[in-house]
């Protein structure tokens, strides 16, 4: 069972029994993802445990999204250069925004809210 008593900064109410990690959404050695609400075409809510950087794999997403750093943090490479993401940061990204995660602090957890899919 996932212990979300990481700090008072964690403000999500997690159900008593989290759904299992979604195997199709797990990037082995990099990211573990839990669905916090039923998946829908209008958007989704996820809890991410980021384990390691993206190995310099520049990518975008099929949807706009908002991220909140709940614990830890990471260094992200963007088209405008590196950006340090820290505990408490909340930011939004457009689907077409290219980026990758360079380095990750141990114990990094984020809450991701996606919008509807806008492209493949």
Task: Walk through the language-model features, giving the residues of each.
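A short, N-terminal "cap"/entry segment at the start of jelly-roll beta-barrel domains
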Residues: 1-44
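Short, charged/polar surface micro-motifs in flexible loops or helix N-caps
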Residues: 41-43, 52-54, 71-75
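Conserved short histidine dyad/triad with adjacent acidic residue
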Residues: 44-61, 95-96
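A generic "structured core" feature
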Residues: 59-60, 64, 85, 93, ...
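Short, conserved beta-strand element in jelly-roll/cupin
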Residues: 60-75
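Short acidic-glycine-tyrosine-enriched beta hairpin
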Residues: 77-100
């Amino acid at each position: 069972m996932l212990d979300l008593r990481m700090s008072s900064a964690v403000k999500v109410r997690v159900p008593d029994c989290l759904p299992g990690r979604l195997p199709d959404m797990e990037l082995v050695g990099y990211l573990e993802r839990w669905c916090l609400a039923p998946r829908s075409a209008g958007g989704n809510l996820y809890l991410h445990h980021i384990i390691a950087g993206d190995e310099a794999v520049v990518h975008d997403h099929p949807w706009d999204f908002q991220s909140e750093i709940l614990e830890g943090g990471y260094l992200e490479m963007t088209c405008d250069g590196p950006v340090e993401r820290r505990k408490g940061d909340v930011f939004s990204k457009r689907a077409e925004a290219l980026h990758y995660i360079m380095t990750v602090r141990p114990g990094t957890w984020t809450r991701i809210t996606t919008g509807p899919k806008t492209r493949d």
